[in-house]
């Protein structure tokens, strides 16, 4: 990242306008922690460092709106060329990861969620309907290729699940 680009991004992050927008942060995330996590993600990916300052700020504000820290599996910061703008500028896009979705589901509904991947050599069985169940025993060695994923959520002694095939 060029020094000028870095200065522009820093100026955007500490501007009064940004401080006003970051007031949407939930109590459990401090502004300094969010910005530190954002910078950490930014410096781990050189392509993000080439993104427009405006798109980086928008990605930061999305993280604040969701109450999720970027990095890990909560929020992915993805650089993409915007083909609809002249010069196809590189822009940063914030996308919730599976752990971020699980966190939001828990916050909104109070439901506990587990997500798992099933591999070719795992023992896996499920049934839909009124007597629905999921049984999954991971292979102890050499799991093979992943072929489906599933999520189980629980709340108030009730359980439900959904299965997604990977094709």
List PLM regions with ranges.
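Binding-interface segments
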Residues: 4-167
């Amino acid at each position: 990242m060029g020094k000028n680009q870095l200065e522009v991004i820093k100026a955007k992050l500490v501007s009064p306008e940004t401080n006003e927008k970051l007031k949407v942060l939930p109590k459990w995330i401090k502004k300094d922690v969010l910005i530190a996590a954002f910078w950490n993600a930014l410096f781990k990916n050189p392509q993000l460092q080439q993104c427009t300052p405006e798109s980086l700020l928008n990605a930061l504000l999305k993280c604040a709106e969701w109450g999720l820290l970027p990095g890990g599996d909560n929020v992915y910061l993805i650089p993409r060329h915007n083909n609809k703008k002249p010069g196809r500028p590189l822009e940063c896009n914030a996308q919730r990861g599976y752990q971020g979705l699980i966190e939001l589901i828990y916050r909104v509904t109070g439901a506990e969620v587990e997500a798992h991947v099933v591999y070719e050599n795992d023992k896996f069985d499920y049934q839909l309907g009124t007597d629905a169940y999921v049984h999954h025993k991971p292979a102890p060695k050499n799991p093979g290729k992943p072929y489906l994923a599933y999520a189980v959520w629980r709340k108030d002694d009730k359980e439900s699940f959904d299965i997604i095939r990977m094709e």
